[in-house]
Regions:
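Active-site anion-handling motifs in enzyme catalytic cores
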Residues: 1-308
């Protein structure tokens, strides 16, 4: 039986591709890519798939095809999708593959409430191996990745309605919070430290292959840094896997869609508001190692699944 991983035809977030790379690294041969939103439509020979990541944009497409044999590990259900995923049919599907390995405690508790056996695994990106991404030509001191991007107004292309009006009202306030957060960062970084800014969001249209290349490049940037400051979990967690010190800034993550994703994952890194930066000495931040038991457990379960 062939192996597969989750892929993303329309995502502009490198974090999605970084999660897929973490899954792909377990296979000797190139796995099949199946789009997360089209799992229900798969109608070829049976495949084994590592079912990890954020689910999903189109929950009406749940559950997946019967020709897909999943290992649920590092699995997250978005709060806005939970009602459509956890229908009677969806619950019965998940029960066939329990226990479900959950990326966060929010998903674990959600599944436990409907009598699905579930446990916390953390994120599959914790299994990434630094050796693969060492690059002597990259020497970052402080790497700042996508801090406070959710506080910046995004391009709006939907018709005017009440929600749009509310968003337009919020834009000046969100931009003020963004500028305030950035000032807090710069104020607390010594002028003799070299700082590099990169984004986890892809700004222009790229092919799927190019997106994976960009994700690999971002992992190299993280692996060859002395410190990572970010508001993105899939920049923070690879840094933890690589033994790179991390400061996770949680400004703008108050909505349930955001804080549900970090429930439990914040055990692995220092999570603070930018206003608290003056209370810590970033030179003394030591990377935690409490992820190792979770990383080893996920690796063992995946290897057993592949070799079955």
């Amino acid at each position: 039986m062939k192996n597969a991983i989750i892929s993303y035809n329309n995502s502009n977030n490198l974090g999605d591709y970084i999660q897929s790379i973490a899954a792909k690294n377990f296979f000797k041969k190139e796995p099949i890519l199946i789009d997360r939103e089209s799992l229900v439509n798969y109608n070829y020979k049976k495949v084994k798939i590592i079912m990890n990541g954020w689910f999903m944009e189109k929950p009406e497409n749940w559950p997946p095809s019967e020709k897909i044999i999943p290992l649920f590990i590092s699995f997250h259900i978005n709060p806005t999708a939970e009602k459509k995923i956890l229908t009677k049919k969806g619950i019965n599907y998940l029960r066939k593959f329990e226990p479900i390995g959950c990326r966060d405690n929010y998903t674990k508790k959600l599944l436990n409430k409907v009598n699905i056996k579930a446990y916390f695994t953390g994120c599959l990106t914790l299994t990434l191996n630094k050796k693969k991404y060492i690059n002597k030509s990259i020497k970052n001191d402080i790497l700042i990745i996508s801090v406070f991007e959710r506080l910046l107004p995004s391009s709006i292309n939907y018709e005017i309605n009440f929600k749009l009006i509310l968003n337009l009202i919020k834009i000046p306030f969100k931009y003020f919070l963004y500028k305030k957060g950035m000032r807090n960062i710069l104020k607390n970084i010594s002028s003799n430290r070299n700082v590099k800014h990169i984004s986890q969001i892809i700004k222009k249209k790229e092919s799927i292959n190019q997106k994976y290349i960009l994700a690999e490049n971002q992992l190299k940037e993280i692996a060859n840094s002395n410190l990572v400051i970010t508001s993105r979990i899939h920049s923070a967690l690879p840094a933890i896997a690589f033994g790179v010190p991390v400061v996770f800034l949680n400004d703008g993550l108050d909505h349930i869609n955001h804080f549900s994703r970090i429930d439990g994952l914040n055990l692995f890194f220092k999570s603070i508001n930018s206003s608290e930066l003056s209370n810590i000495d970033i030179k003394k931040i030591i990377p935690k190692k409490n992820h190792l038991d979770f990383s080893n457990l996920m690796s063992e379960k995946i290897k057993n699944f592949i070799n079955k």
